């Protein structure tokens, strides 16, 4: 059985026991959060597709840790004008494990 969930504006295909990196969740490490926006559930060949989400379907995610991704460098300049700006960014993320899928 697997499900397609939406969190942080992105969609993920998950099974029980999967570990994935999602946009940072407002929960502490070790806490369990509920992904109630389940778009589809596939169970024993039976497909349940929601409009927009499947009713009474829940996916429980355990937050393992929070972190920040690799640094990306944004560099912009204007030619011949001595205008240069260098800026770095590290996107925060949460590493979660799928504990249980209810459908």
UniProtKB/Swiss-Prot annotation:
PROSITE patterns: RIBOSOMAL_L21. GO terms for cellular component: cytoplasm; ribonucleoprotein complex; ribosome. Residues 83-103 are annotated as: Disordered. GO terms for biological process: translation. Residues 83-92 have a biased composition (Basic residues). One of its GO terms (molecular function) is structural constituent of ribosome. Keywords: Ribonucleoprotein, Ribosomal protein, RNA-binding, rRNA-binding. It comes from the Bacteria. Belongs to the bacterial ribosomal protein bL21 family. This protein binds to 23S rRNA in the presence of protein L20. Part of the 50S ribosomal subunit. Contacts protein L20. This is Large ribosomal subunit protein bL21. It comes from Pelotomaculum thermopropionicum (strain DSM 13744 / JCM 10971 / SI).
């Amino acid at each position: 059985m697997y499900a397609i969930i939406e969190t942080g504006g992105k969609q993920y295909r998950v099974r029980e026991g999967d570990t994935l990196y999602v946009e940072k969740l407002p929960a502490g490490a070790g806490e369990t959060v509920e992904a109630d926006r389940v778009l589809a559930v596939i169970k024993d060949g039976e497909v349940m597709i929601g409009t927009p989400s499947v009713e009474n379907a829940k996916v429980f995610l355990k937050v393992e840790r929070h972190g920040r991704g690799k640094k990306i460098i944004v560099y912009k300049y204007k030619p011949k004008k001595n205008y240069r700006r260098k800026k770095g960014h590290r996107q925060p993320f949460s590493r979660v494990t799928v504990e249980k899928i209810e459908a």
